[in-house]
């Protein structure tokens, strides 16, 4: 049954209670959005959707594997049966790098393919699959969640975990952001990339004490997701402040 909720937002990679995706979903749900949690583990996504519903918010969960084009298309079809428009798309799903690879000379090719499939190709594919619904919204917003790693191309910063494959994938995601923004320049759709900063979403891994909470990190993503008609497009931001374009 189509939703009667006026604003709809889909967040990919939203299946962990301490993850950025769920924090963004809660923020948007509290701003009167019907939030769609899309994740490979739909059971976990449904648990989180139920947690939101128990708080009086509107939420649903769908299965999504960005490495599987059939899964992307299936989500598009199923979502079209529930809603007639999509106001916000948060491309949050991300494959994590192998941090043991510190040089472009020893990158594992399987890991590289996984990183690009999720962080770039899957994001692109999902955006195109949902574009018809995005065009039906009065002024849709697309937010690509990037990383400080995109600004580390070719650098070896002391004390910073460095993965050339991950940096290159996020750098490419930033380039995709600019490309999509240009392609949609004649529409009311705004496309931006947001770096949420270092997020304490994996306490079991010993996150740094200075990492931001998921809720704190989500604020900048929500800012980009709720920009007004005169908002920027094709830019890079953190906490609503512009970041310089990554350079080679």
Which residue stretches match the model-derived regions?
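Canonical Rossmann dinucleotide-binding motif of NAD(H)/NADP(H)-dependent dehydrogenases/reductases
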Residues: 2-36
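A glycine-rich helix->loop->beta "capping" turn
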Residues: 4-5, 57-58, 78-91, 97-100, ...
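Catalytic loop of short-chain dehydrogenase/reductase
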Residues: 13, 17, 95-97, 102-116, ...
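Conserved glycine-rich Rossmann-like NAD(P)H-binding loop of the short-chain dehydrogenase/reductase
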Residues: 31-47
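The beta1-alpha1 cofactor-binding region of Rossmann-like NAD(H)/NADP(H)-dependent oxidoreductases
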Residues: 42, 62-77
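Hydrophobic positions on the long internal alpha-helix
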Residues: 90, 126-130, 134, 176-177, ...
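C-terminal helical subdomain
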Residues: 186-187, 193-194, 201, 205-248
């Amino acid at each position: 049954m189509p939703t009667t909720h006026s604003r709809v937002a889909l967040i990919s990679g939203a299946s962990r209670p301490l993850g950025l995706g769920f924090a963004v979903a809660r923020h948007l749900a509290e701003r009167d959005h019907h939030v769609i949690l899309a994740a490979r583990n739909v059971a976990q996504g449904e648990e989180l959707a139920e947690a939101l519903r128990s708080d009086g918010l509107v939420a649903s969960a769908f299965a999504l594997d960005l490495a599987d084009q059939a899964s992307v298309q299936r989500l598009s079809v199923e979502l079209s049966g529930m809603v007639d428009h999509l106001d916000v798309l948060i491309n949050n799903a991300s494959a994590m790098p192998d941090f043991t690879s510190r040089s472009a000379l020893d990158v594992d090719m399987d890991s590289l393919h996984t990183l690009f499939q999720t962080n770039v190709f899957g994001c692109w594919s999902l955006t195109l699959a949902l574009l018809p619904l995005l065009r039906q919204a009065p002024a849709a917003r697309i937010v690509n969640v990037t990383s400080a790693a995109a600004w580390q191309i070719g650098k070896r910063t002391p004390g910073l975990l460095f993965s050339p494959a991950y940096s290159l994938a996020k750098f490419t995601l930033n380039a995709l952001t600019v490309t999509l923004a240009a392609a949609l320049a004649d529409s009311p759709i705004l496309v931006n990339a947001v770096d949420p900063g270092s997020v304490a979403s994996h306490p079991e891994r010993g996150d740094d004490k200075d990492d931001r909470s998921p809720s704190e990190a989500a604020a900048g993503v929500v800012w980009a997701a709720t920009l007004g008609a005169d908002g920027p497009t094709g830019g890079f931001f953190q906490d609503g402040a512009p970041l310089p374009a990554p350079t080679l």
